[in-house]
């Protein structure tokens, strides 16, 4: 099996349904769950939501798989708590890199398909947070932090953000960490969703998708 053959990786469980995936995540103490969005019994979105909401599974990351990068259900998976996605025909080496990226605590985002997908899905009005909670949270960000968040939302990594804003990579990383703390975001994937839903970034504006 591909994952078992990779250094430092071990498959600790497999599941045929979303409900089984949640149960296996609990019983096997997995570090990461590779989740198919379309599964019987309980779809991958709801399974991801349950894993993210389970205090006993804190720290378990979810990487979702989809057949097409136009599958807008991926956005719902990111909202539910997934840390990224890959299409099923991804090259084996890229799949392993993606697993390593998410397992290390980063979100699997890129300026390409992920940003385009999120932008398309969020063109429809999102359900606003109660009492304008998201915009109010953004008020706690400094001007520089808003700039950094906007670049995160476009899929830039810390090194790219540093280059764009003439910062050191460490400073860029520190800004991202502070933003995540202020917005109570799990990871960069959630920061992307928050940036679009709050209106900080709009599709097609200033180079956004």
Describe the predicted segments one by one:
Residues 17-20, 43-49:
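Acidic catalytic/metal-coordinating carboxylates
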Residues 155-190:
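Recognition helix of helix-turn-helix DNA-binding domains
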Residues 180-209:
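Basic, Lys/Arg-enriched C-terminal extension of HTH/homeodomain DNA-binding domains
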Residues 39-40:
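Receiver (REC) domain active-site loop signature in two-component systems and cognate sites
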Residues 36, 66:
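Active-site residues of response regulator receiver
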Residues 8-16, 24, 185:
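Short hydrophobic/Thr-rich beta-strand motif most characteristic of the beta2 strand and flanking loop
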Residues 28-34:
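Active-site beta3 strand of CheY-like receiver
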Residues 74-79, 84, 89-143, 147, ...:
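Short, flexible helix-to-coil linker/hinge segments that flank and couple to helix-turn-helix
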């Amino acid at each position: 099996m591909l994952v078992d053959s990779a250094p430092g990786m071990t498959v600790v469980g497999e599941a045929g349904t979303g409900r089984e995936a949640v149960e296996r995540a609990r019983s096997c103490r997995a570090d990461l769950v590779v989740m198919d969005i379309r599964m019987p019994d309980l779809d991958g979105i709801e399974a991801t939501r349950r894993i993210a909401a389970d205090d006993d599974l804190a720290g378990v990351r979810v990487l979702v798989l989809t057949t097409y990068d136009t599958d807008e259900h991926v956005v719902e998976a990111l909202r539910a708590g997934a840390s990224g996605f890959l299409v099923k025909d991804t090259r084996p080496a890229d799949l392993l890199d993606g697993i390593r990226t998410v397992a290390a605590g980063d979100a699997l985002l890129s300026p390409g398909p992920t940003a385009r997908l999120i932008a398309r899905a969020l063109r429809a009005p999102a359900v606003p947070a109660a009492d304008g909670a998201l915009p109010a949270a953004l008020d706690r960000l400094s001007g520089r932090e808003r700039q950094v968040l906007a670049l995160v939302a476009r899929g830039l990594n810390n090194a790219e953000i540093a280059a764009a804003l003439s910062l050191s990579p460490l400073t860029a990383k520190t800004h991202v960490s502070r933003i995540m703390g202020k917005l109570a975001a799990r990871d960069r994937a959630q920061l992307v969703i928050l940036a679009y839903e709050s209106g900080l970034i709009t599709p097609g504006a200033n180079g956004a998708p």
